Amino acid sequence: MGMSIIRIIPVLLTLFPAQSPAAVPRIAILGDSIPYAGYWPALLESGLRQNSAYRNAEIVNFSLPSETASGLSEPGHAQGAFPRPCIHDRLDAILSRYKPTLVIACYGMNDGMMQPFSKANFQAYQKGMERLKAKAESAKARFIAVTPPLYMADTPEKDSARYNAVLDIYAGWLNGQKNKGWLVADMRPGLSRQIRTAKEKNPGFIYAPDGVHPGPEGHLMIARSVWPAVASFLNLPPDVRFPEGDAFRKILERHNLFKLAWLTETGHKRPGIPAGVPIAKLPRIPEGASTKAGPEAGAAPQPCCLKDTVPI
């Protein structure tokens, strides 16, 4: 009888192999100061964790304020304190140390430097995004490009450089890459609709007080606009209930804890970013990951945990 059990065990191990660490999804979110704030990426994380395939996934926000994919920086950026950082200065470290299986990248807002359309700037953005995708895929990671959000959505009459139209061109190019097999999540149409609806209900609603950085409700709008495409690419249900209140506060605090730890671990050249804890001291995924939506799921998250946010 004992020998029979011994013979059966190898067969069972073949039929039901143990899950290796490599099978756990490892998601890297890249971008500028808007995703760095943590709100919409943390909402996206909460949506992913509501699905069994991503409940215990590693999800880290590597976004960095001021950053571009193009490598461009306007003269006197940040009053001359430092040039804009470029994701390509630190991408190799992220890919080699974190080893993502999926990269979600949202660039463009800084790449045109808030200037009128320039063919040279546009080409630098195109090359930067193409290079980013190629590097991610060469590291065996899937790649999802997210279009840049809106500029001066509350006061378009003040957009003298017609920069939102420049971002339309950048987004249009990304959408055109779908014909080449790119996975692209276009937030701009859904975001525009939500802002328009919010202003119809409340003429005093402000999406982004400075024209660039959304408030908490704006981040929720971005998450709602990005989620359907990301869910489709990952074969997840399109419906999602985003958390709010204390449930979201816990997710955001943990999200930012992991963000700063991994930014410190992989390195960057951007001044003003708080140092993170050593990654060895980060909590285990199941201990901090909440997947429960609050009683008013979908309401705008409360303005918490953004004390480490820095401008573009």
Language-model features, listed with the residues they occupy:
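Sec-dependent signal peptide recognition
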Residues: 2-11
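A short helix->loop->beta-strand "cap" motif at the edges of active sites that frequently abuts
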Residues: 137-142, 182
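Hydrophobic h-region of N-terminal signal peptides that target proteins for export
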Residues: 11-19
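Conserved catalytic region of serine esterases and O-acyltransferases that act on ester linkages
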Residues: 53, 180, 200-312
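Solvent-exposed loop/turn segments at secondary-structure junctions
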Residues: 33-36, 64-70, 102, 108-114, ...
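Extracytoplasmic/secreted envelope proteins and their assembly/folding machinery
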Residues: 41, 45, 88, 92, ...
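Substrate-gating cap/lid alpha-helix
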Residues: 153-189
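Serine-esterase "nucleophile elbow" of acetyl-processing enzymes
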Residues: 20-66, 70-73, 80-81, 91-99, ...
